[in-house]
Amino acid sequence: MSKSICSTGLRWLWVVVAVLIIDLGSKFLILQNFALGETVPLFPSLNLHYARNYGAAFSFLADSGGWQRWFFSGIAIGICVVLTVLMYRSKATQKLNNIAYALIIGGALGNLFDRLWHGFVVDMIDFYVGDWHFATFNLADSAICIGAALIVLEGFLPKPTAKEQA
């Protein structure tokens, strides 16, 4: 017996589309309007700064000769497949988990697009305090982190009883 897509977590795939549009749109604007390394202050402690990341988070493996592009692309594809299956197997009413999965999928696909199209990930958010700068990141990274935090949060929330689920 097949399930209706609307009865599964796949109902929340619109979040993936929203993350992709916002992420890729912001990266397009940076690529069109900034020179590599250019910085524009937005607020105290927050700049727009065009950077290229050839590695993973915090530029992990950025100087590894190119193989990491395909390695991280494979990981992103694998994560997207696993989370999509989890969304299909879950109920549409499990909002927190499905939104979390969709945020992670959207972020992973945004960075995957960059890796495959450009050969690097476009980063642009530079958060700093005084002279200390956090690693430059993008909106896809933010979506992934928020999704992961929601999964952790869900683990601390009380589970509904069988009576409440009925």
Swiss-Prot record:
GO cellular component: plasma membrane
Chief location of this protein within or outside the cell: membrane
Entry keyword set: Aspartyl protease, Cell inner membrane, Cell membrane, Hydrolase, Membrane, Protease, Transmembrane, Transmembrane helix
Domain of life, source organism: Bacteria
Pathway note: Protein modification; lipoprotein biosynthesis (signal peptide cleavage)
Molecular-function GO terms, alphabetical: aspartic-type endopeptidase activity
Top EC class, one word: hydrolase
Enzyme Commission no: 3.4.23.36
Membrane topology recorded in Swiss-Prot or TrEMBL: Multi-pass membrane protein
Catalytic reaction list: Release of signal peptides from bacterial membrane prolipoproteins. Hydrolyzes -Xaa-Yaa-Zaa-|-(S,diacylglyceryl)Cys-, in which Xaa is hydrophobic (preferably Leu), and Yaa (Ala or Ser) and Zaa (Gly or Ala) have small, neutral side chains
Active site residues of this protein: D123, D141
Protein name: Lipoprotein signal peptidase
Name of the gene: lspA
